[in-house]
Amino acid sequence: MPAIVLIGAQWGDEGKGKATDLLGGRVQWVVRYQGGNNAGHTVVLPSGENFALHLIPSGVLTPGVTNVIGNGVVIDPGVLLSELKGLEDRGVDTAKLLISADAHLLMPYHVAIDKVTERYMGSKKIGTTGRGIGPCYQDKVARMGIRVADVLDTDQLAHKVEAALEFKNQVLVKIYNRKALDPDQVVESLLEQAEGFRHRIADARLLLNNALEAGGTVLLEGSQGTLLDVDHGTYPYVTSSNPTAGGAAVGSGIGPTRIRTVLGILKAYTTRVGSGPFPTELFYESGEYLSKTGGEFGVTTGRRRRCGWFDAVIARYATRVNGITDYFLTKLDVLSSLETVPVCVGYEIDGKRTSEMPMTQSDLCRAKPVYEELPGWWEDISAAREFDDLPAKARDYVLRLEEISGAPVSCIGVGPGRDQTIVRRDILQERA
């Protein structure tokens, strides 16, 4: 079987955990391929139990699935161990979680520099989570990062940490007037933490490719969303990695020709956390309604999400840059009881209309949404399990979004629960 990529098609928080959980029972491997604990997935089991995951793939909640934290992820060891303990304390079996030897470790100096930099930037700050993700990726690109495999060689680890802190301490002390970190203490602390995950370190590339050769199905799970991609997102208000489908191959070690299906997760309206342009953003009553009804608060940060109407411009853009083959539309139930539901079908910029993503951020900041008003529905749709169970106007809304997004809507979420899903098309079925 080929690999499947699952990506967010907006600014993150689209409901990727629900999609992974739905597919988990039919795949053998689930891989997290980028990001760190700056993003979170929420999974609600049929029992009503709620799990918030930040580093560990959502497939850990499905028995028998092997989960992998891929080489494209940056791992905070303390967060990893805390998340493992939280799952195990609730009876979740984590024995089949593996960690790529080539994933990078997020160090204390990354967090320190991230937090102090944001404070130093003041009103010009980007709005990071302050968890050290960006500085860790900076070290990766600068070839001075600490990788998971380094904990297996104490001497090399000590040498790398000492070399890194020769520079980092200069930054902390001389620029930001903070205390220097002791290399020996940093190494000692990391080695103590490593005792809790050393047995999970693996050659993930080899294992995943062997699994595909043997006919297994591998689900590649991205965090955040397309518009937060460092290359294709609303730069500079983006993350430091590639959540887009192209990042799945790089962040897992699976060749791109192995990937046959790209499942985009698309919320029935739009949200984003942090700074940056957001053409359809709502304020006052409409924004309050979506925020309250949709429970729009960040899993990782707890910050209230900015809310807006569905934006077909960014949906089409996501379809294009990811090669999306199918969409999973989530939170359709949140729109129930609205008289009309506006959908953004284009932008007006300086008096000119466009249906494409602006090339510059300054243009996007000036973009005014052009709306198409669709009739709403009043019925509670949370019990719908077939497409025909939906009210006619809800079906029309889905079909219109499918038409203007550029890919079929194969699944629809009508509530937070695993079973509150309508499957219109089996995305795991082989296609000609």
From Swiss-Prot:
GO MF annotation list: adenylosuccinate synthase activity; GTP binding; magnesium ion binding
Per its UniProt entry, what is the enzyme's top EC class, as one word?
ligase
- The EC number(s) given in the record are 6.3.4.4
Q: Which reaction does it catalyse?
A: IMP + L-aspartate + GTP = N(6)-(1,2-dicarboxyethyl)-AMP + GDP + phosphate + 2 H(+)
Recorded hits in SMART domains, A to Z, give: Adenylsucc_synt
Q: Provide the binding site for substrate.
A: 299-305
On the tree of life, the source organism's domain of life is Bacteria
Q: Its principal location?
A: cytoplasm
Kindly list the positions annotated as binding IMP: 13-16, 38-41, 129, 143, 224, 239, 303
A Pfam family matched in the record: Adenylsucc_synt
> Which keywords are on file for this protein?
Cytoplasm, GTP-binding, Ligase, Magnesium, Metal-binding, Nucleotide-binding, Purine biosynthesis
Residues bound to Mg(2+) are: 13, 40
The entry's GTP-binding residues are: 12-18, 40-42, 305, 331-333, 413-415
What the record says about family reads: Belongs to the adenylosuccinate synthetase family.
Subunit structure of this entry? Homodimer.
Q: What does this protein do?
A: Plays an important role in the de novo pathway of purine nucleotide biosynthesis. Catalyzes the first committed step in the biosynthesis of AMP from IMP.
The protein's matches in NCBIfam families, at most eight in alphabetical order, are given as: PRK01117.1, purA
PANTHER family according to UniProt: ADENYLOSUCCINATE SYNTHETASE
Q: What is this protein called?
A: Adenylosuccinate synthetase
* Gene that produces this protein: purA
